[in-house]
From Swiss-Prot:
It comes from Lactobacillus acidophilus (strain ATCC 700396 / NCK56 / N2 / NCFM). GO terms for biological process: proteolysis. SUPFAM superfamilies: Pyrrolidone carboxyl peptidase (pyroglutamate aminopeptidase). Removes 5-oxoproline from various penultimate amino acid residues except L-proline. Signal peptide: none annotated. This is Pyrrolidone-carboxylate peptidase. The gene is pcp. GO terms for molecular function: pyroglutamyl-peptidase activity. It catalyses: Release of an N-terminal pyroglutamyl group from a polypeptide, the second amino acid generally not being Pro. PROSITE patterns: PYRASE_CYS, PYRASE_GLU. Homotetramer. Pfam families: Peptidase_C15. Belongs to the peptidase C15 family.
Length: 200
């Protein structure tokens, strides 16, 4: 099995994004399954185009997107992607989309194909905090999550896709105002979560 794991580049004035930093540290194989790592831009629509190109190139069986969720204290697999985006916060292009639906003919929401309960259990057993999230927000994370689900329905019916949010790194947190997690713990937790997903 081939698993494509993506991580976003830094955004919002940050110099680092734990998503791509953790993805880069993942092993090249997990339980004999090939791990393909990809950095994606924090840009509406462009992020989905980059991932689609990678799907067509590598033909993965599963795609897991990883993103930063500042304020969370655990690794959080997402349950559902919603057909809504807000352009109130500019992306890395300096712009944002018109507020509204991501895809005019898309479903209001798509549930992940990943075994998120098993993923949470496995991550906790590895000693890393984890819980299911029911909201991926309305920024580029949810946008990419939704677009991948939309592609699965219309173009890649055998593909399994999902999204995992991770906390800030300690270096991103000032005055201890937000939770954070070390990079080594993120990698440990993501590895356990991915292993549970591919072994389900």
């Amino acid at each position: 099995m081939k698993i494509l794991i993506t991580g976003f580049d830094p955004f919002g004035g940050e110099k680092i994004n734990p998503a791509i930093e953790a993805v880069k540290k993942l092993p090249d194989e997990i339980d004999g399954h090939q791990i393909i790592k990809l950095e994606v831009p924090t840009i509406f629509y462009e992020s989905a185009r980059v991932v689609k190109n990678a799907i067509e190139k590598y033909q993965p069986d599963m795609v897991i997107n990883v993103g930063q969720a500042g304020g969370r204290a655990a690794i959080t697999p997402e349950r559902i992607a919603i057909n809504f985006q807000s352009g109130s916060t500019p992306d890395n292009s300096g712009k944002g989309p018109k507020e509204g639906k991501i895809e005019a003919d898309g479903a209001d929401g798509y549930f992940t194909q990943l075994p998120i309960k098993k993923m949470v259990t496995a991550t906790r057993k590895a000693g890393v905090p984890s819980e299911i999230s029911n909201s991926a927000g309305n920024y580029v994370c949810n946008h990419l999550f939704y677009e991948l689900q939309y592609m699965r329905v219309h173009e890649f019916p055998n593909l399994k896709t999902g999204f995992i949010h991770i906390p800030f790194l300690p270096s991103q947190v000032k005055n201890g105002r937000h939770p954070s997690m070390s990079l080594s713990y993120m990698v440990k937790g993501l590895t356990a979560s991915i292993k549970a997903a591919v072994d389900a």
